[in-house]
Amino acid sequence: MKVSLPAFENARVLVIGDVMLDRYWVGPTGRISPEAPVPVVKINQIEDRPGGAANVALNIATLGGHVQLAGIVGQDETAQALTQGVKVFGVEPQWLTVADKPTITKLRVLSRNQQLIRLDFEEQFDKATSQALFAQSEAILDNVDVLVLSDYAKGAIDEPKDFIAKARAKGVKVLVDPKGHDFARYHGASLITPNMSEFEAVVGTVTSEDDLIEKAQKLIKLHDFEAILVTRSEKGMTLVSQNQPELHIPTVAREVHDVTGAGDTVISALATSIAAGASLAQACAIANTAAGVVVGKLGTSTVSRIELIQALALNHGESGFGVMTEDQLAYAMDQARLRGERIVMTNGCFDILHAGHVSYLQQAKALGDRLIVAVNDDSSVTRLKGPGRPVNPVDRRMAVLAGLASVDWVVPFTEDTPQRIITRLLPDSLVKGGDYKVEDIAGGAEVIAAGGKVEVLGFEDGVSTTAIIQNIMSQK
């Protein structure tokens, strides 16, 4: 399936925050130092990569967005390396240079794809310097759609409430990657994106899904946020918004090599998507996929538009087409709804697939974007149709259905009616063939109560599985 992304080239974003240089010393190690019980690494590669807020800006640029970057640097060699690193990606930095502090640098020593140690070179920036950075950046707000505050608690983002208010007054969405024990600093932000540890540092231990949602809603009301996106590692993401149902997005990471910069990737993908016109739910799905790509890389990295398209397509393949379990189908439906797709569901035995079935399923598919066919398993068919049925076992019936162009997902159920599975999945439209009354259709009341529709379609006259079986038997 072709996955549609927003027009990232239309995105205009300002990133302000703690910029830093991620420096990597890499080499083999094969012995222990005689001076101390530590490995000796023979450095044969040195690499510099923009990190922190600079990595956010690079991710936006790599996706194709237009980005301006503001941050604080020292008068040193690492500032020059950082400047060169962002310019390679087409980002022109707006630095506030200070003479008495170094450019923040994170030096990592790696061997055999493993990080052995990290050394930090940094000093805290004071409030006056932070306010000078905001003042220097204020004019840029007139030319952007989204402001990102990338806070690593190094001092660049100190008391940003007034700047957030100025941005919101200009119609600019404000996204914050927060730090610290008090989110009141970000009062009025459109969206904050704490990880689970950062979230619990503010609200206390989260004991359940309901507890997480309740605590997030309290923060939203207290600090006038529009939404909170909690990133939860292997549990994916949870989006809690004002006056909207919560949204859980499962993780899509396949192999985790390094989580360095994953938070940067999330907020950059969110910012680029929102600035390009995506809904918040769509932006979260894109950001989740981007994070899944970047943690599969070593060190601070970016995600390109092509990588994102490929990953979204692969995710769709995994969430899949064809025969599924109920759990797999529930996830596939969540992904489809994030893409704004309408889901239609029907059910039946489909013992011997015939032209009437094909026509009916084509009509059902035309009512939406995705079609689910729930199929009675063998024991259920026998109870409903009697001895000698089904003619074809359930795995073969489902395989044939899955091969039809009109059918996206096929799922078995064991009961005599699909009441339970329909109630669990709650499609946007429930379809039944024949002369049923809507009020008599299993699961129909639940679908309607959830805001969905129930429709009855006619079968093709003179074509039925029973008639086909009788015709075959009469010719013996």
Swiss-Prot record:
GO terms for molecular function: ATP binding; heptose 7-phosphate kinase activity; heptose-1-phosphate adenylyltransferase activity; phosphotransferase activity, alcohol group as acceptor. One of its GO terms (biological process) is ADP-L-glycero-beta-D-manno-heptose biosynthetic process. Its EC number is 2.7.1.167, 2.7.7.70. Residues 345-476 are annotated as: Cytidylyltransferase. Residues 1-319 are annotated as: Ribokinase. InterPro entries: Bifunc_HldE, Carboh/pur_kinase_PfkB_CS, Cyt_trans-like, PfkB_dom, RfaE_dom_I, RfaE_dom_II, Ribokinase-like, Rossmann-like_a/b/a_fold. ATP binds at residues 195-198. SUPFAM superfamilies: Nucleotidylyl transferase (SSF52374), Ribokinase-like (SSF53613). Pathway: Nucleotide-sugar biosynthesis; ADP-L-glycero-beta-D-manno-heptose biosynthesis; ADP-L-glycero-beta-D-manno-heptose from D-glycero-beta-D-manno-heptose 7-phosphate: step 1/4; Nucleotide-sugar biosynthesis; ADP-L-glycero-beta-D-manno-heptose biosynthesis; ADP-L-glycero-beta-D-manno-heptose from D-glycero-beta-D-manno-heptose 7-phosphate: step 3/4. Signal peptide: none annotated. Homodimer. This is Bifunctional protein HldE. It comes from Shewanella frigidimarina (strain NCIMB 400).
